[in-house]
């Protein structure tokens, strides 16, 4: 905890829209936290119903040069400008473009509505989930030359 002033980043479109809908003119840190949870809950499966840990991979940050190379092939690539030379690309978009959205293999797969969510269909082992995640990483690396980084903690 700190008493310092914080700058709250509220430029994420769904967050801005929800702040407006709920008429919160000066959102607090707690407001933002609650709204982000609400947004995620509306987009992602409930782990109590379908085993998952929400976003499995981080959104990669790439160079302007790499973005230009990818966008020459994929005109509608979504991205967020971080600086003149750094851009963030949604990992879910990369995974979907590799044909892995909604893909099921054995007892694991990606969620049908969000490619970034790896699901456990009831009986998948940690090894099966890990191997599936590595398959996704290899496909994205091969197609886009981007190495995805896990957002989850991998425990041996």
Please provide the spans of the model-predicted regions.
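Phosphate/pyrophosphate- and phosphate-bearing ligand-binding catalytic cores of soluble enzymes
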Residues: 1-118, 123-127, 143, 147-156
